[in-house]
């Protein structure tokens, strides 16, 4: 034993390196063990649903999964097969997995797809936007859009996951929670933006549209990968060297919020009234004047015009902060000031890369149900629509309130109902 400790003391550098390696290896193995426990617990919970008996005349639910293997730098397929696929197969659904090979394929497949009971998106913001656009471009979208949609966040940017699922620093737990939310069947209605250019078919977005200098600098962050943790600030710093001040001129016309119709009450079985009461009700409805038609006066839409000079413009839904008790439906138009300094541009821009919901001080926010954005000819630049790049052009943006039903964590849904957004 004395010789052993003497050897360690004489070779203290190797001993220190070996101890660090052993500690790291133990921590890595412990993390893998915890991930396996999370997967096992999720599979056992899904098995409970799979063991439930269904009526003889009922059919097994059909689920169609649109998997983007290229998401998360090519790791999405492995993440899905290890963390989500076993849960879906154990819960008793008939699962069909469609792997996309190129950008836009999910959009085309959905326009031709036959009916299914559940649509599942396994990917990031881009994959989700393709699926939503494919659903709402169908000729029978009025009925097809009623199919609930599940979202398994596998991409680098999965903005909607913060709304639908509880926050988690563990990637495995985040994916298993999202998959179990589909199994449990709780849904929430989400708004959709319809964005239509002059020539192309409309594009549909769940988060929103961004146009401006913060967006332009943010997409160049990966170009400075060799700077490590300084790459975000470097992208915004070099952006200020190319051109300053960076202003975007445009005009926007918009209409105000619309009143949210009351939710339909749940149907409850009632006892059929007697024949005498039914005859009286028929006579009363026959002789009554059609007051509803006379009382309903359609007020013309009031459009407001705004000329703007901004460093960035964003048109977003309220899906990131749902308020079930709200009496109005509207989208947010945020016009950020063009008077910020270079230092503030670098600081705020670096924060917006991690949290696009942040805005500079002095930002003007408007509420609208639809708007028309006109940009000067030759302005160039690009839009970001749900983190996907599109050529900047004049567009019409319309809010489709509570258009799609998305599966969400029951805990998150309960939290929305008990503490609505302010």
UniProtKB/Swiss-Prot annotation:
Catalytic activity: a monoacylglycerol + ATP = a monoacyl-sn-glycero-3-phosphate + ADP + H(+); a 1,2-diacyl-sn-glycerol + ATP = a 1,2-diacyl-sn-glycero-3-phosphate + ADP + H(+); an N-acylsphing-4-enine + ATP = an N-acylsphing-4-enine 1-phosphate + ADP + H(+); 1-(9Z-octadecenoyl)-sn-glycerol + ATP = 1-(9Z-octadecenoyl)-sn-glycero-3-phosphate + ADP + H(+)
Renumbered residue ranges of the record's region Hydrophobic: 15-31
Any single GO CC term annotated in Swiss-Prot or TrEMBL for this entry: mitochondrial intermembrane space
Keywords from the named record: Acetylation, ATP-binding, Kinase, Lipid metabolism, Membrane, Mitochondrion, Mitochondrion inner membrane, Nucleotide-binding, Transferase
Topological category with respect to the lipid bilayer: Peripheral membrane protein
EC assignment: 2.7.1.107, 2.7.1.138, 2.7.1.94
Gene3D superfamilies: Probable inorganic polyphosphate/atp-NAD kinase, domain 1 (3.40.50.10330)
Quaternary assembly: Component of the TIM22 complex, which core is composed of TIMM22, associated with TIMM10 (TIMM10A and/or TIMM10B), TIMM9, AGK and TIMM29. Interacts with SMIM26.
Chief location bin: mitochondrion
Source species: Pongo abelii (Sumatran orangutan)
Pathway: Lipid metabolism; glycerolipid metabolism
Residue ranges of the TM segments: none
Cofactor: Mg(2+)
Lineage summary: Eukaryota, Metazoa, Chordata, Craniata, Vertebrata
A GO molecular-function annotation: ATP-dependent diacylglycerol kinase activity
Compartments reported by the entry: Mitochondrion inner membrane; Mitochondrion intermembrane space
Region feature (Disordered): 249-271
Residues covered by the DAGKc domain: 58-199
Family to which this protein belongs: Belongs to the AGK family.
PANTHER family (alphabetical): ACYLGLYCEROL KINASE, MITOCHONDRIAL, SPHINGOSINE KINASE
GO biological process terms, semicolon-separated: ceramide biosynthetic process; glycerolipid metabolic process; lipid phosphorylation; protein insertion into mitochondrial inner membrane; sphingosine biosynthetic process
Its biological purpose: Lipid kinase that can phosphorylate both monoacylglycerol and diacylglycerol to form lysophosphatidic acid (LPA) and phosphatidic acid (PA), respectively. Phosphorylates ceramide but not sphingosine. Phosphorylates 1,2-dioleoylglycerol more rapidly than 2,3-dioleoylglycerol. Independently of its lipid kinase activity, acts as a component of the TIM22 complex. The TIM22 complex mediates the import and insertion of multi-pass transmembrane proteins into the mitochondrial inner membrane by forming a twin-pore translocase that uses the membrane potential as the external driving force.
Highest taxon above the source species: Eukaryota
Name assigned to this protein: Acylglycerol kinase, mitochondrial
Modified residues annotated as N6-acetyllysine in this record: 6
């Amino acid at each position: 034993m004395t010789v052993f400790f003497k050897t360690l003391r004489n070779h203290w550098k190797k001993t220190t390196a070996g101890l660090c390696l052993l500690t790291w290896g133990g921590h890595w193995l412990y993390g893998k063990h915890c991930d396996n426990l999370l997967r096992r617990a999720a599979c056992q919970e899904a098995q409970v649903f799979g063991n439930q008996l269904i009526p003889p005349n009922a059919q097994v639910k059909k689920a169609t999964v649109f998997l983007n293997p290229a998401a998360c730098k090519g790791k999405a397929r492995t993440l899905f097969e290890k963390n989500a696929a076993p849960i879906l197969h154990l819960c008793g659904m008939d699962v069909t997995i469609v792997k996309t090979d190129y950008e836009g394929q999910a959009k085309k497949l959905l326009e031709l797809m036959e009916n299914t009971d559940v649509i599942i998106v396994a990917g990031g913001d881009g994959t989700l936007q393709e699926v939503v656009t494919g659903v709402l471009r169908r000729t029978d979208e009025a009925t097809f859009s009623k199919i609930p949609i599940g979202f398994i966040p596998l991409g680098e940017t999965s903005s909607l996951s913060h709304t639908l699922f509880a926050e988690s620093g563990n990637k495995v737990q985040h994916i298993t929670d999202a998959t179990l939310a589909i199994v449990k069947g709780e849904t929430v209605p989400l708004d959709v933006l319809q964005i239509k250019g002059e020539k192309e078919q409309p594009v549909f977005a769940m988060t929103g549209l961004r146009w401006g200098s913060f967006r332009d600098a943010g997409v160049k962050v990966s170009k400075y990968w060799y700077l490590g943790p300084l790459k975000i600030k470097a992208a915004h710093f070099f952006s200020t060297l190319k051109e300053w001040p960076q202003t975007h001129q445009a005009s926007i016309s918009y209409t105000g919020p619309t009143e949210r119709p009351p939710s339909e009450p749940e149907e409850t079985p009632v006892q059929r009234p007697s024949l005498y009461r039914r005859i009286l009700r028929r006579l009363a409805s026959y002789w009554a004047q059609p007051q509803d038609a006379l009382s309903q006066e359609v007020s013309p839409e009031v459009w407001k015009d705004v000329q703007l000079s901004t460093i960035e413009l964003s048109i977003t839904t309220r899906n990131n902060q749902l308020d079930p008790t709200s009496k109005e439906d509207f989208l947010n138009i945020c016009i950020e000031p063009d008077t910020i300094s270079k230092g503030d541009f670098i600081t705020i821009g670096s924060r917006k890369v991690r949290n696009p919901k942040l805005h500079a001080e002095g930002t003007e926010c408007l509420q609208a149900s639809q708007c028309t954005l006109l940009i000067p000819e030759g302005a160039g630049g690009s839009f970001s629509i749900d983190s996907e790049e599109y050529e900047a052009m004049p567009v019409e943006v319309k809010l489709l309130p509570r258009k799609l039903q998305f599966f969400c964590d029951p805990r998150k849904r309960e939290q929305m109902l008990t503490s609505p957004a302010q």
